[in-house]
């Protein structure tokens, strides 16, 4: 008997179009003899589009602004065995949709409310990973009211870290709002930008040498496995929004061109982070590797990484011998497992 799957795509974050591309890939890959898949696109305005508008959005990559607020149908998820919430960033990967589906009592692919929310929030992620002893670059927290009332205190925290440093909104994806700050004179503009997007901001030290950006995929629930390690190479100062989403700006290397013992360290730390953050189903864990010193720093954990056939996460597991179709099938199976 076929399993009925509700595939959610689009969403209100800056990764709306990436989600639509991922959804097209997943729709084509789920075996039709095993699954009956119904896609629903959520517009950038948060409207849940009816079937005809959903199909148009998937075909064109552009969603309409209309549609009904079909929360009652999604919450009931009547007749569906599981939901695949293929949504990235705020209002999709941050525990919000996971809470809705949990209230509805419907199984879904990926981390639950806690794992999704904590992994999306850079402050909470760093605090949990600190407590688990997982290495990260030095960082400080600042909140908007502090910046408005006692800006010198925030500037002092930046001075403690030294320059250059990064300024990052705590709860946004796609590298949106991130600035590289080379001197104290550049700090105020970067903080103003970040605080315009989030009430909490992370100040993050830079490594003394430009690090290599390496990534590993995790698959599983309580007994997860790690993929081979991949590497991203690019000319930009950091992996910003433009580099991330402009074709040809970054190159993917699988396996990463690093010593085997470093790859094993990365895989071990990624599994530790996955468990510490109470993730489930899947995650892509990103690290900085400083070749000159041998240091390794965890950068972030993505609980719903990009999922086109050319995205890093599926490619990592393809290198492990798992085809794209087998991977998405396994994710649905994991969603249906009792946790």
UniProtKB/Swiss-Prot annotation:
It catalyses: 2 D-alanine + ATP = D-alanyl-D-alanine + ADP + phosphate + H(+). Its cofactor is Mg(2+); Mn(2+). It is found in: Cytoplasm. GO terms for cellular component: cytosol. Mg(2+) 2 binds at residues 300, 302. The keyword RNA-binding does not apply. Its EC number is 6.3.2.4. It is an enzyme of class 6 (ligase). Pathway: Cell wall biogenesis; peptidoglycan biosynthesis. The keyword tRNA processing does not apply. Residues 126-333 form the ATP-grasp domain. Binds 2 magnesium or manganese ions per subunit. It holds the Pfam family Dala_Dala_lig_N. Belongs to the D-alanine--D-alanine ligase family. HAMAP family: Dala_Dala_lig (MF_00047). This is D-alanine--D-alanine ligase. It comes from Deinococcus radiodurans (strain ATCC 13939 / DSM 20539 / JCM 16871 / CCUG 27074 / LMG 4051 / NBRC 15346 / NCIMB 9279 / VKM B-1422 / R1). The gene is ddl.
